[in-house]
């Protein structure tokens, strides 16, 4: 089992440097998505590690967007995060804001799913249900093809993420929708308490 800080400690660090509800919601979503993927892909014993990486992946983004994934190691060291966790967090910015390569499967999942959760979340907000619970891949693909929709979500990063994992775009979308379904209620509850 890989070592990581207690969730309460990780969440406190996130909130120390992030106050915007949107950023906290995104972090909680990616935390839940990463936990789901760990269990789905056979890494259940490391689910807490995967989830912590998801929770902290954007720890530096709100205060230091121009130093995203560069400032993160310093912040993560405040709570004694391992080099492995720091590498994983930084790797999701590969080719975007840093040159840390995603090597482990978990890092590749984070790289792929991070951007896609933003697109899925935006698509969910457009649905009558405002939820991913009734979202299908075919509906998401229509939004994906519309470059003006959620324009800040890079389709190139999502495609590269799927390629790094050796998955089709549809497979990545389907799995990430399922992952977001698994944590949507808990994330909404946590965000409403902010």
Where are the model-predicted features located?
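Acidic/His-rich, divalent-metal-binding segments that scaffold phosphate/diphosphate chemistry
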Residues: 1-64
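Predominant activation on well-ordered alpha-helical scaffold segments within soluble catalytic domains
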Residues: 11, 28-35, 70-73, 120-123, ...
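Divalent metal-dependent catalytic cores for phosphoryl transfer on phosphate-bearing substrates
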Residues: 43-149, 159
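Conserved active-site and cofactor/substrate-binding residues in soluble primary-metabolism enzymes
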Residues: 5, 25-29, 67, 84, ...
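A structured, mid-to-C-terminal "fold-capping" secondary-structure block
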Residues: 133-194
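Short polybasic/polar patches that bind polyanions
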Residues: 15, 39, 77, 145, ...
